[in-house]
Amino acid sequence: MKNKSKLLACCLMALPISSFSIGNNNLIGVGVSAGNSIYQVKKKTAVEPFLMLDLSFGNFYMRGAAGLSELGYQHVFTPSFSTSLFLSPFDGAPIKRKDLKPGYDSIQDRKTQVAVGLGLDYDLSDLFNLPNTNISLEMKKGRRGFNSDITLTRTFMLTDKLSISPSFGLSYYSAKYTNYYFGIKKAELNKTKLKSVYHPKKAYSGHIALNSHYAITDHIGMGLSFSWETYSKAIKKSPIVKRSGEISSALNFYYMF
C-alpha cells in the first residue's frame, strides 16, 4: 500500500542540518522510488519519479512527496516539543481496479481521502539523555476512517556531511478504514478470485527504515532510504492482498534555502 506521508517521512527524516548553511529552512527536490505492493497488482515492482517539498511560512508549512502530503500549522512549545494541526489531501491506501490482476479487477477503485490530522513531536535528547533521538505521533481522520502512526528515530552524524537515521514504528488503522481499503462487498464478487464477502476489523502494521543523507554543498544534498512494513492479519487475509509486507526504497536530490 503506497502511503505518501511515509514516503515523505523517509525522504525528509533527519536531514543533516549541521552540514548546511544556517537559515536553510525550506527544501525542494526530486527523486525516484521503487517498491512492491501488498495488493494483487499486475506490476511486480513499481518505479516512480516524484517531487518533494518542505516549505515553511512562519508557523505554517507545506510538505509533499509524490503530491501534497500535508498543509498545516506548527506550534513550538519548547525547543524539544512541538505540535501540528494539518490537512492531508491524499491520505489512504488507494488502488485502481485497472492495476489489479484479472480476477481481482471487479472491485471498485479505492480512493484517497482528505484527512484532518494532529501531530506531536518530541526530542528525547534531554529527557532520556538520548542525543539526536526523536519520537513522533501522528493521528489522521477522514470520511473513510482513522489511522495513526508512532515512530522513533535516531540520527548518527558519521561525518560533517553524512548522516544515517534508523527508525521503527507502529501504525493503527480503524475498522472503517481497513474495511474500505481491504474489504470486499457483495457487489464486487465474481466467479473466479473474489467469491466471498470480506469485512475486516481494525488493523495494525509495523515498519522499520534506514535513511541516509549527504550534503554535497551548503545548499544541495542527496538522500537514500530503505523501508520495510508488515501488516496484521486483518489486512493479510484480504482477498485483494497478495503479501503481508512490502519493501521500498527511494533516492532523492534536494536544494535547501
Curated annotation (Swiss-Prot):
It comes from the Bacteria. Residues 1-21 form the signal peptide. Pfam families: MipA. InterPro entries: MipA (IPR010583). Keywords: Cell outer membrane, Membrane, Signal. It is found in: Cell outer membrane. The keyword Cytoplasm does not apply. Coiled coil: none annotated. GO terms for cellular component: cell outer membrane. Belongs to the MipA/OmpV family. This is 24 kDa outer membrane protein.
